[in-house]
Amino acid sequence: DIVLTQSPASLAVSLGQRATISCKASQSVDYDGDSYMNWYQQKPGQPPKLLIYAASNLESGIPARFSGSGSGTDFTLNIHPVEEEDAATYYCQQSNEDPLTFGAGTKLELK
């Protein structure tokens, strides 16, 4: 299975600042020119919400302050500027290979 290692496990960011979350895969999640890495946001009591798919594509309805980058084994989610509603746990997920796997999550809090 592909192991996804997220960092940091938690971070506290001031309103309007940038939050950066990293995800490293144990092997490449690229195939045929695409990177099969996705990012989700989850708030307590709610299902995960897809933010970014294929490393850098913004899901419909998601604000442009969310952006994703990376390829191969190294990926990043950026949130800028951070807003109050962004306090949540964020997960990376690879969809290149079964079984689909998730990172352990990064909890974003506001200072």
Curated annotation (Swiss-Prot):
Residues 54-60 are annotated as: Complementarity-determining-2. Residues 39-53 are annotated as: Framework-2. One of its GO terms (biological process) is immune response. One of its GO terms (cellular component) is immunoglobulin complex. Keywords: Adaptive immunity, Disulfide bond, Immunity, Immunoglobulin. It comes from the Eukaryota. SUPFAM superfamilies: Immunoglobulin. The keyword Disulfide bond applies. Residues 102-111 are annotated as: Framework-4. Disulfide bonds join 23-92. Residues 1-23 are annotated as: Framework-1. Coiled coil: none annotated. PANTHER family: IMMUNOGLOBULIN LIGHT CHAIN. This is Ig kappa chain V-III region PC 7183. It comes from Mus musculus.
